[in-house]
Amino acid sequence: MRISFFLLILAVIIGYAYGYSCPKPCYGNMCCSTSPGNKYYLTDFCGSTSACGPVPSCSGALYFTADSQRFGCGKHLNLCRGSKCVKAQIYDAGPAMWVEQDAGMMIIDASPTICHVLTGGSSCGWSDKFEITATVTSLTDSRPLGPFNVTEEEKAQLFIDHEIAMAQCEAEKTCNGFDLE
């Protein structure tokens, strides 16, 4: 009886730990949903194809991300870890939903430069569990692509701007996989 109870408790704990499921799958193998609280794990990539046009070079200090299925091609994201942030442009789709399921959390795939700026490391994998926030920039944001620092008040404003930008792209059906409906 005790062993059965122990196994049941263990199964419940494992289910919660690895229970991530995408609320809105799209394109066969990706997730179009955005993360509650805008929290994601950071991974890095450097691809040979792009869902949004030209493939960015992987050499040099470039600030790009995937996740076009969530936010839209060409949009800008503010990626923050603590008070360190990077403004980046969306160039590609991804990651695959199975990667997020293995990680147990939604992921922002970003350039190796972004990984280095936000973590100090040379690579970011989902198992590193580098948690960041990702917010869509406002249409009036004139900040150039690249790193910047924020205060708590400025970070709060990034979240407000994100909600406004997401409401606009949802109304225009240019994000969250609306083109699939």
From Swiss-Prot:
Q: Where does it live in the cell?
A: Cytoplasmic vesicle lumen
Instruction: Print the keywords alphabetically.
Output: Antibiotic, Antimicrobial, Bacteriolytic enzyme, Cytoplasmic vesicle, Disulfide bond, Glycosidase, Hydrolase, Signal
Where would one find the signal peptide in this protein? 1-19
Q: Name one GO cellular component term.
A: vesicle lumen
Q: How is it modified after translation?
A: Contains six disulfide bonds.
Gene Ontology biological process: defense response to Gram-positive bacterium; killing of cells of another organism; peptidoglycan catabolic process
Record bears the keyword Hydrolase = yes
Quote the catalytic activity from the record: Hydrolysis of (1->4)-beta-linkages between N-acetylmuramic acid and N-acetyl-D-glucosamine residues in a peptidoglycan and between N-acetyl-D-glucosamine residues in chitodextrins
Per the UniProt entry, the propeptide covers 139-181
**Which coarse location class describes where this protein primarily resides?**
cytoplasm
Domain of life of the organism encoding this protein: Eukaryota
State the EC number(s). Answer: 3.2.1.17
Top EC class, one word: hydrolase
What GO annotations for molecular function exist for this entry? Answer: lysozyme activity
Question: What does this protein do, in the record's words?
Answer: Has antibacterial activity.
Q: Per the similarity annotation, which family is this? A: Belongs to the dictyostelium lysozyme family.
| Protein name, as recorded | Lysozyme B
Query: To which species is this protein native?
Result: Dictyostelium discoideum
